[in-house]
Amino acid sequence: MSQKEIWSETLHANFGQYFSVDKVLYHDKTEHQDLIIFENATLGRIMALDGTVQTTERDEFIYHEMMAHVPLFAHGNAKRVLIIGGGDGGMLREVCRHQYLESITMVEIDAGVVEFCRQYLPNHNAGAYDDPRFNLIIDDGVNFVNTTDQKFDVIISDCTDPIGPGEGLFTSEFYQGCQRCLNEGGIFVAQNGVCFLQQDEAVTSHKKLSNYFADSGFYQAAIPTYYGGIMTFAWASQNPALRHVDLATLQQRFDNASFTCRYYNPAVHVGSFALPQYLLDALFTGCTI
């Protein structure tokens, strides 16, 4: 029996995870980062940037549903959405399911990610790039939010980890820019790592977001692909009530949307804001594990 090639993630220095490679579909350096897309017998097609897994066909729906539907159903009347990053197309797919939206803008720094994910991960976008409401802008997200004249109801930062091209999307400059281009009652959410292993990211993000938003916090989802399992998402708004929309209201909005999900539902939405004590201790007492 021939031995399969092994691809190892390099996100953490002292531990990590590996994946067997059935077939490499694409591997090269784009203008900004190393991009590989390969097939795995269990997880389907996997895309990684600079040695860190970004998405897999098997469980991408969890990440994309929770980042898209939690803020959109909490808002309840969003018309304009901004996605920062998201070049694989999965976030766009989920956002496009909300038929009442009038405009969906995606700002992606790396055109290569969009091009090759459209070719090799077509199930992620599922045709969403052809939605007439969609506008793609190739630009740095920090620059865009600090220079645009547009306003948005929901901003979703579908960023990489705070290294390489994604580093700027965890800065005060970026958070301040998002605050300036959010409409009144708007919501900002962002990928914020696996808090058990990356607590410093959550603590730092919380401190920075608190400087620009009246209400900031986190919600979570269990996503097997990301080492450590429990992914944390940053949340920020000027209206604290948006983080506490009741179950009955969410259920009505979800029913009116007339689509189903594989992970998200209104009860999961409410429960996702219940945080483990170790994270609360890190955020509010400075005690870390």
Curated annotation (Swiss-Prot):
PANTHER family found in the cross-reference section: SPERMIDINE SYNTHASE, SPERMIDINE/SPERMINE SYNTHASE
Family matches, as CDD domains: AdoMet_MTases
Residues annotated to bind S-methyl-5'-thioadenosine: Q33, E108, D140, G141, P165
Summary of subunit composition and partner proteins: Homodimer or homotetramer.
Name under which the protein is recorded: Polyamine aminopropyltransferase
EC number: 2.5.1.16
Keywords attached to this entry: Cytoplasm, Polyamine biosynthesis, Spermidine biosynthesis, Transferase
Pathway assignment: Amine and polyamine biosynthesis; spermidine biosynthesis; spermidine from putrescine: step 1/1
Organism: Photorhabdus laumondii subsp. laumondii (strain DSM 15139 / CIP 105565 / TT01)
SUPFAM superfamilies (UniProt xref): S-adenosyl-L-methionine-dependent methyltransferases
Subcellular location: Cytoplasm
Active site: D158 (proton acceptor)
HAMAP family, A to Z: Spermidine_synth
GO terms of biological process kind: spermidine biosynthetic process
All residue ranges annotated as the PABS domain in the record: 5-238
Pfam families for this protein: Spermine_synt_N, Spermine_synth
